[in-house]
């Protein structure tokens, strides 16, 4: 490009011109492109190429700033035309996002000056407006068509072939450097560099970068081990494999996802390609076998191998795929969004105490129940990890309606751990065991652990983008749970059914809440990334009379005014900074920590947490009310954000209460699930505590009919009451 500094030796530049979508070009009437002025010999025949319309602009030379290679420069101004000393190719550019078919992707090559370059894509006769097609031009001194807002893409430094399609893969030099580093750090000999190249190629063929998704680190390494085993390759260790991945996918980040105490490392920004063979596996038994689990655990339930022939049909009749195979392939694709490396916790032992067992029930029967129920729960975990939700109904029917009877003798009970999966418990014996209160309480606690593990497997991160097909499958699964269990336990006593259904109902409600929260998060993410919407929200929020909101809400909430003002300022500041959804989540988490800090370790922590949720929701409603009365332009955005933040606050408080009480979130939410069994003693205790605090406040506390927040302004000695 000629300019004031570089002259004719400056690097090559190619202009991408934004253009409206052009109609397809007919196959027969060819359209001749720009006849570019060149330094080629006279009489040389130029080859016409059919293209969408390209506007010819008179040649002009305008001084430009020095442009460096391998960069993208945005050029402001009018119809400026730049002269290029070594032009490669000019391409039409469509600002709308497009998916380029492989047949329309073209490549361009470096060539010496003065040579004629013709680059044409192997596209069909009707060329869409977004296709990348080549231009027949002389290389020497041809004008580049330019316009307002043109993007200049500059040529590379070397003389190697370049692909026009942008990818996040590393260059060959980077891959060679990664191999050299591995050879030095791991002592790998040079003759094994070919093996490393095959590993790198496997990574590039099966994985791609994608924003907003993550993949368990153990899952990716297990896929790699499977590949090495199938192709009889020597795998590198996990640490070296991690270095290899980071050299291929630049900027890859690592996150620790999951609940506190049971989180796993994930690679953030990478996923399986949709066309990867790993997505078409019907039953990844080796992958499941390599999950992190204690060595003493036996092989678990394999539904696709034991109940039907999905696994066999996938390997022998891949040319004729059935709907079941398509569903299995989709499940394999969805497994990257769940936590398949989750370790199933151990169950506690039943506390029988001094309770006398019923007639016909022995301690051997109790131990048999422990073993059989553990295996049943492990089978449930494996079915859910495979996303084969319809097998849950079959599992429950087979467990709670065993064909064996106590008259078959002790052989029907597992006498050892050698064959646990073949062991069954007679139905009448199972009913007798469940009628024992300590056994029923033990089974309830086991269910809390089981269903909490299933929640963490299916939804490891409530804010992470998840395909709508997976979300809908989880919601349909939650909708069917209560009916399946009630049908399977129809012959059991009503008390046993109520206990079991109460826990599974809390599990189903949690799945519905978390999927709704995830849906809100994806909708709000688009709002938080829109600068104009954020500015409008900030403008509307500054018009809200927060002093009036505090006056009205103080009588109900009795919150400390300084805390409310601080939250208001923090909210506006976070909004002004155009924070991401993850940053908002961190701020909400800090609010919960700040408010509940004074109640840490106190028996009143659960009640204080519930009161905070009520007050947060009330204040949010008052702000939304003010925005509604003012006909705020950003009311819709605020309404969406408010729904998301309320749900996420519920999620945070739920987990804080579970951590404080030593229970699982499922157990916390199932505490008041059955309104018929709601004990008023807890409410009485809360009321008694309130009365006791009221009596300590003095006799005039009941006589004054105004809120504490208002009275504190006139009474400087009155202590501030926190949220």
Swiss-Prot record:
What ranges are recorded for DNA binding? 199-274
* One Pfam family in the UniProt entry: BCD_RFX
**UniProt-listed GO biological process terms:** acrosome assembly; cilium assembly; regulation of transcription by RNA polymerase II; spermatid development
Molecular function (Gene Ontology), one example: RNA polymerase II cis-regulatory region sequence-specific DNA binding
* Principal cellular location given in the protein's record: nucleus
Q: Does the keyword Membrane apply?
A: no
Which regions are flagged for Polar residues bias?
A: 323-332
User: How does it associate, per the subunit comment?
Assistant: Homodimer; probably only forms homodimers in testis. Heterodimer; heterodimerizes with RFX1 and RFX3.
Q: What is the originating organism of this protein? A: Macaca fascicularis
What does UniProt give as GO cellular component? cytoplasm; nucleus
InterPro entries from the entry? DNA-bd_RFX, RFX-like, RFX1_trans_act, WH-like_DNA-bd_sf, WH_DNA-bd_sf
Keywords carried by this UniProt record: Cilium biogenesis/degradation, Cytoplasm, Differentiation, DNA-binding, Nucleus, Phosphoprotein, Spermatogenesis, Transcription, Transcription regulation
> What family does the database annotate?
Belongs to the RFX family.
Q: State what this protein does.
A: Transcription factor that acts as a key regulator of spermatogenesis. Acts by regulating expression of genes required for the haploid phase during spermiogenesis, such as genes required for cilium assembly and function. Recognizes and binds the X-box, a regulatory motif with DNA sequence 5'-GTNRCC(0-3N)RGYAAC-3' present on promoters. Probably activates transcription of the testis-specific histone gene H1-6.
UniProt name for this protein: DNA-binding protein RFX2
The subcellular location is:
Nucleus; Cytoplasm
Where Phosphoserine occurs, the residues are: 28, 416
Positions of the UniProt region annotated as Disordered:
1-46, 292-332, 689-723
Instruction: Spell out the Low complexity composition-biased ranges.
Output: 10-20, 307-322
